[in-house]
């Protein structure tokens, strides 16, 4: 019986501690209207588990804790989009996370929706690597 309890506790610890909010490599699709196509860029962003609590009922003494894995520090990098017309602005600036934290999602700078467009969304029919 103790081995079953140990296994359960170990799995819980692993799920919480080892899948915590951390930097991860992702590929995003970026587009420039002036260029008429999308390109894929590798960048770093935050992903993982954050403790959250959503009560079934409202209790002013115990507010809901809704934390998400989000950036603590950002830098911006710029890439030249190849193949744009000569008169078009071919530079694209995108965020790169350098440090992560579990915190409140800032809707002013982050897509906090349950189902956003996703990192591979492209509004043009043509996509280039």
Curated annotation (Swiss-Prot):
Signal peptide: 1-20
Glycosylation sites: 25, 42
A single GO cellular-component term on record: extracellular space
Glycoprotein recorded as keyword: yes
Compartments, as annotated in UniProt: Secreted
Record-linked InterPro entries: Cystine-knot_cytokine, Glyco_hormone_CN, Gonadotropin_bsu, Gonadotropin_bsu_CS
Keyword Cell division among record annotations: no
PROSITE patterns for this protein: GLYCO_HORMONE_BETA_1, GLYCO_HORMONE_BETA_2
Disulphide bond pairs: 21-69, 35-84, 38-122, 46-100, 50-102, 105-112
Keywords assigned: Disulfide bond, Glycoprotein, Hormone, Secreted, Signal
CDD domains the record matches: GHB_like (cd00069)
Principal subcellular localization: secreted
GO biological process: follicle-stimulating hormone signaling pathway; G protein-coupled receptor signaling pathway; regulation of signaling receptor activity
Family under the similarity heading: Belongs to the glycoprotein hormones subunit beta family.
Quaternary data: Heterodimer. The active follitropin is a heterodimer composed of an alpha chain/CGA shared with other hormones and a unique beta chain/FSHB shown here.
Protein task: Together with the alpha chain CGA constitutes follitropin, the follicle-stimulating hormone, and provides its biological specificity to the hormone heterodimer. Binds FSHR, a G protein-coupled receptor, on target cells to activate downstream signaling pathways. Follitropin is involved in follicle development and spermatogenesis in reproductive organs.
Protein name: Follitropin subunit beta
UniProt lineage: Eukaryota, Metazoa, Chordata, Craniata, Vertebrata
Protein encoded by which gene: FSHB
């Amino acid at each position: 019986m103790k081995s079953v309890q140990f296994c359960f506790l170990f799995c819980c610890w692993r799920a919480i501690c080892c899948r915590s909010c951390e930097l991860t490599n992702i590929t995003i699709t970026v587009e420039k209207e002036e260029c008429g196509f999308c390109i894929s860029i590798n960048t770093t962003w935050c992903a993982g588990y954050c403790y959250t609590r959503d009560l079934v009922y409202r209790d002013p003494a115990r507010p809901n804790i809704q934390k998400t894995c989000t950036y603590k520090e950002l830098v911006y990098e710029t890439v030249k989009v190849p193949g744009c017309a000569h008169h078009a602005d071919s530079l694209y600036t995108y965020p790169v996370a350098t440090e992560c934290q579990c915190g409140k999602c800032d809707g002013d700078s982050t897509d906090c929706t349950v189902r956003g467009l996703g990192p591979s969304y492209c509004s043009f029919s043509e996509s280039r690597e």
